[in-house]
């Protein structure tokens, strides 16, 4: 993802921080499918982020190519949930 693509993603999330789907059992993590122009049908990325409503912040946790991986494993979701919990409590 280029810097310009990342800025476009950030701008979209500022406007609609709830645009990603909630990941069940994740404690509020969201998954967003983001298309990157010129890369074809499978050329986009999936972005995992957490929206901290009380602080009006969005924490970007993970981005990966759609062509490489469909969903996070339950273990990955659990680990990311623990990371967010530690940030919220720390």
Positions of the model-derived regions?
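Enriched for short, Lys/Arg-rich terminal
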Residues: 51-90
């Amino acid at each position: 993802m280029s810097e310009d693509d990342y800025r476009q993603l950030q701008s979209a999330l500022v406007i609609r921080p709830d645009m990603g789907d909630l990941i069940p059992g994740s404690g509020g993590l969201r998954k967003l499918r983001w298309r990157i122009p010129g890369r074809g049908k499978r050329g986009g990325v999936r972005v995992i982020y957490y929206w901290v409503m009380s602080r009006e912040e969005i924490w970007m946790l993970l981005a990966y190519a759609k062509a490489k991986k469909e969903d996070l494993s339950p273990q990955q979701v659990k680990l990311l949930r623990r990371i967010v919990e530690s940030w919220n409590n720390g």
